[in-house]
């Protein structure tokens, strides 16, 4: 439930080396830029006024840093990564414009501010690549593997249905294949009346043989053995995968399994969106492929 989402926890920042390093560098770069902009504003002259656009870039950069801190601290990267990527893309433009305005100047304060903007731009580019990448991509999975805090297990189910444009395939073979007939059996099956329909089947003047209609129209009383049985799990698991996020199985589906972040699973087939996996304790079931990365 959305109401049960946790608040900001510093463990999500301190336990993630990538988040801690980039946020620290970004905050340091912003402090350099902000102090240098203040000094540059004080040292401005009538012939060389301080560009006011730099203040907007400085304020926007602070909003980006705070936003990234809140998203990572609240463990909601999976939910807001698209919005964060859009804001970061706009930040690259603003910060780059600030560099262009301040770099080519004789003032040391303005050059220091431009250096801070350059450092901010580098961090924003890295953030854009991180938040804009799929969680199962190799670079992002590598960075997430160093995080100590576990990803929240309350991720909305719609993200799973939206992965690849489809949901999980059925895991039982209850669908019966269509019955095939020969040309001899279908001989005389033509309907002479354009509106006769099914009501004339088996009646007077019917073009369908009575013996054939009985065999076709009557449903089968029994299904083939094992029609509704569950799929037998495989005996070989040649692949090994590492969980990049925690996942909680659907309580209504006995085929799914739950696992925690960084847990190692054995996988039998990696061709679909849902993989047949086995945990270290011997528990087997299906797991979403975008939560795993092959080793």
Curated annotation (Swiss-Prot):
Protein encoded by which gene: SHO1
Listed SUPFAM superfamilies: SH3-domain (SSF50044)
Extracellular membrane side: 40-52, 103-111
Protein name: High osmolarity signaling protein SHO1
SMART domains: SH3
Source organism of this protein record: Fusarium vanettenii (strain ATCC MYA-4622 / CBS 123669 / FGSC 9596 / NRRL 45880 / 77-13-4) (Fusarium solani subsp. pisi)
Subcellular location: Cell membrane
Subunit description: Forms homooligomers.
Pfam families the record matches: SH3_1
Residue stretches spanning the membrane: 19-39, 53-73, 82-102, 112-132
InterPro entries in alphabetical order: SH3-like_dom_sf, SH3_domain, Sho1_SH3
Cytoplasmic side: 1-18, 74-81, 133-295
Function according to Swiss-Prot or TrEMBL: Plasma membrane osmosensor that activates the high osmolarity glycerol (HOG) MAPK signaling pathway in response to high osmolarity.
Every SH3 domain range: 236-295
Family: Belongs to the SHO1 family.
